[in-house]
């Protein structure tokens, strides 16, 4: 094990101390991630140490009890984002400001449209004279511009809809960008997809068959989890169920195993739904009058998936009336749910402590994007759009942020 030199000031004298690399790594691994990244610019030796698997394991172990940073972003992505709720003051990353503020806003030199995000990566669509896609880490300020897909210009109906990652040992090893020909999303048995892989640096075009008819695919509400993309088919009907989740495994080798159509768990249609992730699972939140039900998708392998009812709560015990509507779940704390109220404010409910917290208290709140988003959702709720499913994107960070994966050809 090599020794490394550390300068130490004592009694006005500059002393040079040599520390074993193993001891030095253990000391540095206790620091927040944002501080560790500064050491990479000291010299090649520091960079090599910090980027090693050995150091990464030390860091993950040292911060095993620390929560990670996250944000709930209002609505579907677009030209700009605004954080509804989040947490950034963790010892693991040590970020000085809210995580949502790192996502490039509207008004940069190029026009950036935010398409998707997952595991600390963000997919941007740059709309100028020449449309391009970029994937990067806003926190690390690393961006990779993707090569143009060869079918650009052939069909104006091809849109980027999703970003999915392959994570190993807490590190993003690869990502794939998925585009869809949206002319083929109404009452279809197959979909036309264009997929870019950071491993190969190339685009592929493929036609994938669905196990049953897709009635109406909501491509804008795309959720990424466990190497899979999830969309909504709010008009799907199976027995007495209304609505389904369309799950697509981007990394599956067998075409027959790539698509799953999973009906929603509750049998009634006259309630408010939201779908999100929490604790590494896909979660469906159903509100029927004053009853709130939380369903967790346990497996995808069966024909219709397997849901488990994890919570059933009477909202009157929290002082909520029937005007409250589900919005999202805490990304990691499965006992915390977020709801909107008639004043278009966001509240969180801790199902363990029975504590209700108001998250929007500013006097200028009515001028924010969050207020207008919740107002739109509330109008939809009051209009009794029974089949609608609300989706609030989450921007979360993995246990360790490595460099953005890129093909050797880029």
From Swiss-Prot:
Record-annotated membrane-spanning stretches: none
Keywords attached to this entry: Kelch repeat, Repeat
Keyword flag Repeat: yes
Classification via PROSITE patterns: FBOX
Domain F-box intervals: 13-58
Kelch repeat start and end residues: 177-227, 274-327
Protein name stated in the entry: Putative F-box/kelch-repeat protein At1g15680
